[in-house]
Amino acid sequence: VVVWARNEARGKEMEKKAAAEGLAITFDKVDTSDFEAVTAAAKRVADKFGKIDILINNAGITNDSTLKKMTVEQWQNVIDVNLSGTFYCCKAVLNYMLEAGYGRIVNASSVVGLYGNFGQTNYVATKAGLIGMTKTMARELGRKGITVNAVAPGFIETEMVAKMPENVLDGMRAKVPVGRLGRPEEIAAAYLYLASDEAAYVNGAVLSVDGGMTV
């Protein structure tokens, strides 16, 4: 497993924690919004391991503002990381998967990509765009032994969410039929399934992991 990210300090910390648990995870500092950097990183992975079986695209940022106040820079920055970055990563690994006749690509969308969200025109556009990208790639690559799917998380207990006021968290929970926020490991389980051979006949799907928010 190789993790690409821009934050070297957090990447190295993750690498150490994984090693302490007996997991072989390598961190590589990569800006996924830079196509040349991603292409070079993919080559390093292929050279080291001989192949690339699975790609999970979960790099993402937010830069929220209403349409009236949103700057072009805010718009473009989120597009570059969330949407273009996913395209770049898929493009960079594709030939390795085609050569092997096998691949699993899982893209991180969001429930807001399905129904929108106030003050997030840029972010929602990327998450909705990822759904369209996923379905199109699934049609193109399915016969090549490569499946492409997406996960659409709802409200998840992340470090950022944990800092929110309790009344805000209560409002979030009230919108979820199961009455609680999701856990990171529940999202990870969805990724793991879609990346596995058990999901070989799942292609072009958008798996909502949201406690029923989108029902």
Write out the residue ranges for each language-model feature.
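Conserved glycine-rich Rossmann-like NAD(P)H-binding loop of the short-chain dehydrogenase/reductase
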Residues: 1-13
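Substrate-binding pocket helix/loop in short-chain dehydrogenase/reductase
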Residues: 66-67, 74-79, 161, 172
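The beta1-alpha1 cofactor-binding region of Rossmann-like NAD(H)/NADP(H)-dependent oxidoreductases
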Residues: 8-9, 29-43, 72, 185-186
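Residue(s) in the substrate-gating loop at a strand-loop-helix junction
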Residues: 110
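Active-site helix of classical SDR
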Residues: 90, 126, 134
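Short, small/polar-rich loop/turn modules that mediate ligand/substrate recognition or access, typified
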Residues: 142, 147, 202-204
